[in-house]
Amino acid sequence: MNTPDQSQLGRVSGYADQYDASLLFPLPRQPKRHEIGVTGTPPFFGADLWTAFELSWLNLRGKPQVALAHITVPCETPNIIESKSFKLYLNSFNNTRFADAAQVQTRIRTDISEAAWRGSDRQATVGVKLVLPEMFDREPVQELDGLLLDRLDVECTHYTPAPELLHANHGEAPVTETLTSHLLKSNCLVTGQPDWGSVRIEYSGAQIDQSGLLRYLVSFRNHNEFHEQCVERIFMDLWTRCRPIKLSVYARYTRRGGLDINPLRTSHPQALPANVRTARQ
């Protein structure tokens, strides 16, 4: 089983420019899920939506080609893909010749699927969509919808996760709300480098105290964990402490190394959102 300290994070790495799928470094989801009380089938659905902004290869005549890539990794895969290894893997396409973009897309889908499902009896594919330059002007920028929590003038004193700040009013009629914040910040599990994100929380049930929720989100500020793990922690803290009927937690993190990761976790199956970047991305 791979562990984060075995990855290339925080190390000086050489950059292969010839295709090499072995650069991908999957990490099991379960150890971090165990920390938040998820020991069997997770009580959530969803996916990790990746955007790759630095993808290039050569055509059969040696001419460079470029594209964006949208990659969708279901959260039921046993592994996440460590992001630096993903970057190194994509860089290995740089001087490799492919017949066309479809061949590149198929290659990425095959490799990411194998890494994400490695070690599992179940095998499935991840979603991969390439956006070619003639379609770049159709890539929108859109902010997360919902009532902005950041408008609240709260005093913040907790900078490591403090789920005790979460409260819901179970004595009143249930509500349906969508709340957002741009103040989510955590740190890379291995390097401690800052990760900046915006988060959207949609729920139905007892009304969640908004001031406490904002202070709780701020409490991730000095916490070291990968993006996917932070979102699952937020989901589980809200699910167990506020006991909503329905819950969705969706975060969009700023890019690093030409990649952004945008995890979604929901209590009920639902269609995935379009992978649309925000202004900060």
From Swiss-Prot:
Binding site for NADPH: 83-84, 256-257
Binding site for substrate: 81-83, 227-228
Catalytic residue positions: 188, 195
KW Cell wall biogenesis/degradation (keyword) present: no
SUPFAM superfamilies: Tetrahydrobiopterin biosynthesis enzymes-like (SSF55620)
GO molecular function: preQ1 synthase activity
Any GO BP annotation: tRNA modification
Pfam families, A to Z: QueF (PF14489), QueF_N (PF14819)
Keyword annotations: Cytoplasm, NADP, Oxidoreductase, Queuosine biosynthesis
Localization per record: Cytoplasm
Assigned GO CC terms: cytoplasm
EC number: 1.7.1.13
Assembly description: Homodimer.
Role summary: Catalyzes the NADPH-dependent reduction of 7-cyano-7-deazaguanine (preQ0) to 7-aminomethyl-7-deazaguanine (preQ1).
Record-stated family: Belongs to the GTP cyclohydrolase I family. QueF type 2 subfamily.
HAMAP family named among the record's database cross-references: QueF_type2 (MF_00817)
UniProt-recorded name of the protein: NADPH-dependent 7-cyano-7-deazaguanine reductase
